[in-house]
Amino acid sequence: MNSSLKTSILSPVRWVGVLVLFSLFGSVALAQKAPRVTQHKLRILHTTDVHGNIFPYDFLNDRPGTGSMSRLSTVLREIRRTDPETLLLDAGDLLQGEPPTYYYNYVDTLSTHIVSSAMNYLGYDAVAMGNHDIEPGHSVFDKWGRECKFPLIAANIISDKTGEPYFKPYHVFTRAGLRVAVLGFTTPAIPQWVPAHLWEGLHFDDILTSAAHWVPLIQEREKPDLLVVLMHSGLENDNPDYLENAGRALANKGMGIDLLLIGHDHRQELEWIRPEGSTTDSVLLINPANHLDRVADIQITVRKEGGRVVSKQLVPSFISLEGVEPDSVFLRHFAQEYAAVNDYLATEVGELASEVRGEDALFGTTPYMDVIHRMQLESVGAEISFAAPLKTSAVLPAGKVYVRDLFKFCPFSNFLYAMQLTGREIRGYLEHSYAGWAATSITEDGGLIRLRPGAQPTDKYKTFVPPYNYSAAQGIDYTVDLSKPEGERVTILRLTGHSEPFDLDRTYRVAVN
């Protein structure tokens, strides 16, 4: 035998060992190839347009109220027992609408704001800024932001100084083994309603333009398992000049957004929207409407294989707060704040000789509007006043008037301005107002109010435009002839108490709010 040739013969025992080793390595290889499958469950609760409804009490009418954060607290205690990682999000409009917010916006400005205290107590995770959160001004919303133990988010509110978002654009949460990115937006229509000095140093970008920048950036930088948009903007847009309500438009873009939590338009919505060009995926859009009468509840199941998301299931519903008992622990915790607000509202400010009803302003002159017009005319020394019935449901009985009653006239903190307008502009403004207000002709049932096409008696919003846009004038004598075409209905005769004819070319001092 050639000594350079070596052979090796394995014994049966050694062959068995080799087979075992190959078997083990093969099993390891197979295990590495089979990705690990995990299932994650997450619950998201969504509120919006709370407008300061913190206590279960109607401060204006001095009686028990509906909804409120106190009832939400009861629901949260129950949910968190079984789902402790629940995300609690709000789509804005918290700082105006109820007496407690007014009190802490303008009366007691040193204490911690009741809204930040209550939301911290409830454990909110993020809030998108609303127009009524900007309207109180920097002194209020900047202080509020410092007090909140959660991020205020709005990617399209931009600092003029830095060119970057003034608030945090988005926040990423890790809950139930998932990375959840929450991107915030607000309606860019704020400059149309809110005086510039209240948002000095800021501007408001279009939501779709902003989303086109931030969504891909978040997906690349954060690689979230879920992408949620929390947005103070409604479903349908009817304004040709700017995208006030971007819900449907953004859902149509898709962009990988899983969930759109919207608000602003006070409408309860739940809709699956298939993005343009998509044949499979849909975006869930949901809005629980205003006042905290209900909460949007989205229960999410995400399946991962090897750490990669392979399926998502979203099951939406609404939790009604009707009949829910207010949380007694919550009420005890905020008893001092409640008492402070109630004492302020009980301050006597005047007396009424007869009852005043807001709905009377829909059909003609009324003491309700007379009070507002008189205050406006006297406050700025105007010749003419424009005002609309901001609360048509308001009823003030004859007798003493208290601070709480003033909120029935003006539930929001509107600002009074004096403008220089020509007679032609004044008539044009009234024509515009009555075009949305008055019927195009006397209807068969004698109705004078213009309704939405197809409006039903049970509809919450029946009028062609909201009554808070029904601007009428005082300080002039004028008629509105409904038998004439739109644009030719208003005839202004004279300034009230004057004999000279109204001059369309003259400039007048006009009070508006």
Language-model-detected regions and their locations in the chain:
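Feature captures C-terminal
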Residues: P35, H40-R43, N53, R63, ...
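Acidic, metal/ion-coordinating pockets
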Residues: A31-G323, F363-M375, S385
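Glycine-rich phosphate/diphosphate-binding loops and the adjacent beta-loop-alpha structural elements
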Residues: L345-T365
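Bacterial N-terminal signal peptides
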Residues: V16-G26
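Acidic, Ser/Thr/Pro-rich beta/coil linker or hinge segments at domain junctions
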Residues: S320-L352
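Flexible, glycine/charged-enriched surface loops at secondary-structure junctions
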Residues: R221-P224, L230, L345-V349, E383-P389, ...
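N-terminal accessory/precursor segments of enzymes
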Residues: G184-P195, L314-F318, S328, D343, ...
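Bacterial N-terminal signal peptides that target proteins for export
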Residues: N2-G17
